[in-house]
A protein has these predicted regions:
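N-terminal pre-domain segments of enzymes
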Residues: 28-83
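Short coil/turn segments that connect the beta-strands within blades of beta-propeller domains
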Residues: 66-67, 116-118, 164-165, 205-207, ...
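Extracytoplasmic beta-rich repeat domains
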Residues: 99-113, 141-161, 186-200, 217, ...
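C-terminal substrate/ligand-recognition segments
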Residues: 109-122, 133, 438-466, 474-547, ...
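Short loop/turn segments that connect beta-strands within beta-propeller blades
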Residues: 132-135, 180-183, 227-230, 318-320, ...
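Short, conserved, GDST-rich strand-edge loop motifs in beta-rich repeat architectures
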Residues: 210-221, 279-307, 355-369, 459-485, ...
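Blade-level signature of beta-propeller repeat domains, shared across WD40, Kelch, NHL, RCC1
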Residues: 558-603
Length: 603
């Protein structure tokens, strides 16, 4: 077990732009990791914080208390925009650390949830902790003994879910586990299959809905709904179109049973008014076209649809799993450019500005108001669709346009997408630079409804790829975009979803894999690989506050309130992308295994 509590409070620096202030030791608690054994649940004999627990209802999930954070992005629409405003542009300079809790070594890509003053969080090793959200005190811990250790190679679950009096944990060994929210005892568990649960879950109308990686072959690639009370399977939607499915022809194969495309990333979103579930799907596998299509790069289409339902937005009936519509963002992917992660469900007027937006649907009336599903791809495109029917509204390369950009065109009237054929691997040993590579990934965006803006962390990364050939070993490496400014490798973008206009701020060299968070206090929070956790003005991007933590910020960022006091929580630690990101800035010497929870509040 690592030992990191000795870093001491003076190592945690706070600044309001340039004025540093160190929190006195009496204002914070540094708490050690827990020590239970796999397969056990340990509960505190006295948990006064649990006395206020109330079961979570469907109405609470639809309209959560400002005090709670009940799912990975707080609300079904993935806004990550809190109505709390005690911490605001005037008071944020006084923000201090309230408590810290160390976690054990391992992978942490998770986002805590909070209900009635209790924080539930996935800890490294595939554990679930319940803590007093005001001070980090232990309530209970569940440590899973993996039943399928062969597939539980990385405990990468992104989020827990909560409903009634149960917390739902999609464990790395392919099980969905329902835990008693008060005690941590197992209420039920159900095996999804030989797939790794990397995504997390949301609960919609009494169903626990989750995705994950694929196991072996197309039958292992699906989104599943399980009854929240019993764990009984309700439905599955297979993300590789099977024979008999209208999308099967897009594979141009008699047998695609060994092809795969998963939902490994962030969970789906839900429009309660329309009763529609939206999910993003990752790239097809194997990663390149020749490997999937018997050595023929033209074995599938150059325009959408190709290899369905890879790189798609899916609109599903949450009660049955039936497909309502799909939109394919990139056909027949050749470069592992996932279009998974959250779809932001906003309502905006259609007024894209050609200065900022490359592809605009010319048939849509200017000023018309649309309920949209917006997404930012790992491969670097912002898409805005009408979520009623999947109609294409606008899209643009992100963070910049580039000759090595993987998309060559979009038919703006139909929304049909076309990949960049010049960058497709056509012969063994081919080598290409492709843009972009993980310009964002499983760290969520945030949408500030008051100014119609999506806040997105970006990395100006491309990839140098080579496939195997005679005397040539396959390989790839991440590189800055050719011609880019090395001192502006990373940053944050404020993207207006009505106009497409962008404001870039916090430009620098430190890659970020922390979640975005906006608040009614006029703030946007974000952290990066430099150990800096910052608050900015949501309108201007001006930095208002900064804390220097013990390690790189990892996903996680949330805010909540208990007894009238607002808290901001962030986690540091190791996750899948940390070695790759750290390699880009080796001179930073970022501590990559500093797994901890940090919580801040006003004095």
């Amino acid at each position: 077990m690592k030992r990191i509590s000795a870093f001491a409070l003076p190592a945690i620096l706070f600044s309001a732009v340039i004025v540093a202030a160190v929190a006195p030791r009496s204002e914070a608690q540094i708490l050690p990791p827990l020590a239970t054994q796999p397969g056990q649940t340990v509960t505190s004999p006295q948990s006064p914080a649990m006395k206020n627990f109330t079961p979570v209802t469907d109405e609470m999930l639809r309209n959560p208390s400002p005090n709670d954070w009940l799912m990975y992005s707080r609300t079904y629409d993935a806004f990550r925009d809190s109505p709390l405003n005690q911490i605001n542009t005037k008071t944020v300079k006084n923000l201090r650390m309230a408590w810290v809790r160390d976690l054990e070594d391992g992978v942490t890509e998770t986002i805590p949830i909070v209900h009635d003053g209790i924080m539930y969080v996935i800890a490294p090793g595939g554990y679930v902790d319940a803590l007093d959200a005001t001070n980090g005190d232990f309530i209970w811990e569940y440590r899973r003994a993996f039943k399928n250790p062969g597939i539980a190679t990385n405990e990468r679950t992104k989020a827990l879910a909560i409903y009634k009096d149960m917390v739902y944990f999609t464990a790395a060994d392919g099980y969905v586990v329902a835990l008693d929210a008060r005690t941590g005892k197992v209420r039920w568990e159900t095996l999804k299959g030989e797939t790794q649960n990397t995504s997390g879950a949301i609960v919609v109308d009494g169903n626990v809905i989750s995705g994950g990686t694929c196991g072996k072959g197309s039958d292992s690639c699906f989104i599943e709904a399980d009854n929240a009370d019993t764990g009984e399977r309700v439905w599955r939607f297979f993300t590789v179109a099977h024979p008999g499915d209208p999308g099967f022809a897009s594979w141009n194969q008699d047998d695609n049973s060994q092809s795969m495309t998963s939902t490994w990333g962030l969970p789906g979103t839900f429009d309660a008014k329309r009763d529609v579930l939206y999910y993003g799907v990752a790239n097809p596998m194997p990663d390149n076209r020749m490997a999937r299509h018997n050595g023929n790069p033209d074995g599938t289409g150059r325009v959408s649809p190709a290899d369905l339902y890879s790189n798609c937005t899916l609109a599903l009936d949450p009660k049955t799993g039936k497909l309502i519509w799909y939109y394919q963002h990139l056909p027949g992917d050749d470069w592992d450019t996932d279009h998974t992660h959250e779809r932001t469900l906003a309502r905006v007027a259609f007024n894209p500005n050609p200065k900022y937006v490359k592809w605009i649907n010319s048939t849509v009336p200017r000023g018309s108001v649309h309920d949209i599903a917006a997404m930012v791809a790992e491969g670097g495109t912002i898409f805005v669709l009408d979520r009623n029917n999947g109609q294409f509204l606008w899209a643009t390369p992100f963070p910049y346009d580039d000759p090595n950009y993987i998309m060559s065109d979009i038919d703006v009237k139909t929304g049909q997408t076309k990949l960049n054929w010049d960058l497709v691997f056509k012969q063994p040993g081919d080598r290409h630079i492709t843009c972009y590579w993980n310009t964002r990934s499983y760290w969520p965006t945030a949408y500030h409804e008051a100014n119609e803006s999506l806040f997105v962390p970006f990395i100006d990364n491309c990839r140098d790829n080579q496939i195997a050939g005679p005397g040539v070993k396959p390989g790839w490496k991440v590189i800055p975009r050719p011609g880019s400014d090395p001192n502006k490798l990373t940053g944050l973008a404020k993207v207006n979803l009505s106009t497409g206009e962008q404001l870039r701020f916090d430009l620098g060299r430190a890659p970020g894999n922390g979640a975005m968070l906006t608040t009614a206090g006029g703030l946007v929070f974000h952290g990066d690989m430099s150990r800096r956790f910052r608050a900015f003005d949501v309108n201007t991007g001006e930095k208002l506050w900064e804390a220097i933590l013990g390690g790189n910020i990892s996903v996680s960022t949330i805010t909540y309130a208990v007894n009238g006091k607002q808290y901001v929580c962030v986690m540091t630690g190791f996750n899948l992308k940390v070695p790759e990101l750290a390699a880009e800035v080796p001179d930073m010497h970022t501590p990559t295994n500093h797994n901890s929870i940090y919580v801040f509040a006003l004095p």
